[in-house]
Amino acid sequence: MQESAYFFRFGEAIYRHKMTIVIVWLIIILSSLPFLPQVVSPFKSTGLVNDHSISAKADNFLKKSLPFYGPKLLVLYKSSTISTKNPLFLAEITASLKKLESLDLPYKITYPSRSNAYLYGQNHHAAYVIISFKADAHLSDEKLIELKNLIQPAQHMKLFLGGEPVFIQNTNQQTQQDLVKADMIAIPVTILVLLLIFKTLIASSIPLLLGGSCAVLMLVTLFVLAQCFSLSIYTLNIALLLGLCLTLDYCLFLISRFREELTTSASIKHALAMTQASAGKAIFFSGLAVFASLSALFIFPINMLFSVGVGGIVAVSIALLLSLTLLPALLGLIGLRINHFSLLPVHLFNLRHLHFWRTMATKVTYRPLSFFVVVLIFLLCLGYPFTRVNPGISDLGVLPKHSNSRQFFDEFQHSFAVNTLTPLTLVVHTRKPLLSRASLKSLVQLNQSLKRHPFVLKVNNIVALNQALNAKDYYHLYKQPDKHLNKLLKQTSGRYFTVFTLISRFPMGSAQTNALIEDIRHMQLDSNVRIELTGTPVNNYDVMQTIKAYFPYALVWVMLFSYVILLILLRSLFLPFKAILMNALSLCASYGVLVLIFQEGHLHQWLHFEPQGMLDMSLLIIIFCALFGFSMDYEVFLLSRIREYYLQTKDNTLSVIYGIEHSSKIITSAAMIVIVLCGSFMFADVL
């Protein structure tokens, strides 16, 4: 095969320049280490937004047009002894925030008052304030710490901090802690698994060395890219997991094949070249398949999916580069010493050692239909719960209960309607000046129409101050000089627009709230006004609709490119189709298990998490792209080994038995490594 010849010569070239390759990689890795302490700092948003949607454009319009339509910090005050009706309650809140005057950032504080009655709790023992910043305000971790220190404890109250800046800070901090926790669990277990697989100290240590190198290079590369692109705070965890799994898998494939070739090759150079021509070629095409699967994330105009796509592509690229250059160079330097320092008896290539897999493969090949039906029924049964999937968007429930954001949310919902935290925001544009008679009449009509909707709990705007006032009354009211009215107009309106905030009676993401969004978008409006919707419920709804609209294109992309890559590798029309079909079945089975455990809550007591009643839509897409690529990884390695023997014997049955016999142990070992790495993240506090 021409491709094999290329990889054979590539292996010989690596052997000739092995020392140079190792030194170059060592310099790159060492020069990356100083950046590690600050890798998390550029990741500042969840990324759950479609930047091209009407809601995102409306949000950007408000950020440019209103003075304090930027990050918001929420401070919740609760007292068991003082009522909100007592003047002392507001006095203590004011005193608590007094030191904010020394803050060097422009800000605005919205206190609870008669005109802001929604800031008072239903039980009259809680209230919260909103500290708003300008859209271009950079609330770094240091600035947030300064803010928290300036907010003084109230004498008779407990206070809790919330808002998106706190959520992002909590998520970043928890991500760092989770990475350390996962490493503490994964590293010793991975070492044990590698020792059981390779049975020698040197062979077992190489995958750890490559995995650590991959982690360093990947984190620093994403840090650099985050200076150029807005990347989601969830990128690091997912990318790190993908990178480590791929690197360790590729190490297992290459090292095991190298040790096998050492037993039959006349020289180390020839063994390395043969390894590259077989396992190296399989790894290259496997990487292309994973690359194609993850690149489908770029089809979605969602920042979070784009971010994970960037992280995944970086992970695959670095894993491939290390596995196809640094790893062979190290193997060339180590040579026969790869089998030194044996900790367990080494019978790696003894035929009796392969008896189990040969027996199983023989039984399967002689009764293929029976095994196919049994496995198919099993996978379909596992996948059946997926028919009950309830896709949604994750909220603060993914954070641990001890985080500031989660504590704020849990306390908030005891005293307030949770929906007040996530109102729908209507940007109402008028053709004539906002305070003209015609515009005010249109605004009053719109306000009344919204209030009549059965799903609407409350509407706030400049024509909802008093139910007794009509358009004519508001016209005369805003003609009068009044500092409070002027302040209200400055905060909510411009010359040709104003903002309505609307609270739904139903939870964010519910069918009723989504129906409300559609109803408002299709309202029959006065010709003088035009509305745009934004706000968290609208952004989330747009994200869901965007994912549903673009998923068929991503599906075709993944299937088509996977088929083409396998077609080039295997020179068969049927085998790529078979591989894609099996991947689809295993993916459905995985989704079914996810529904059973994480949506419906089975085993949640043992796994120590709170079921959310839904599965995150973006996570389902990420799992599809990543898992399809990963399962293709094993398909490529197994089928390439089967084809290699088929080209020698032209016997289909024997080649299948041979491929399973010589590949299954290393594939199951690689899968075990992936299970260990993924399992270590089960102990993470971010769900």
Identify what each model region corresponds to.
Residues 1-41, 106, 135-391, 525-528, ...:
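Membrane-embedded transmembrane helical bundles of large multi-pass transporters/channels
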Residues 44:
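Loop-to-helix "switch" segment enriched in basic
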Residues 47-48:
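Membrane-proximal amphipathic alpha-helices
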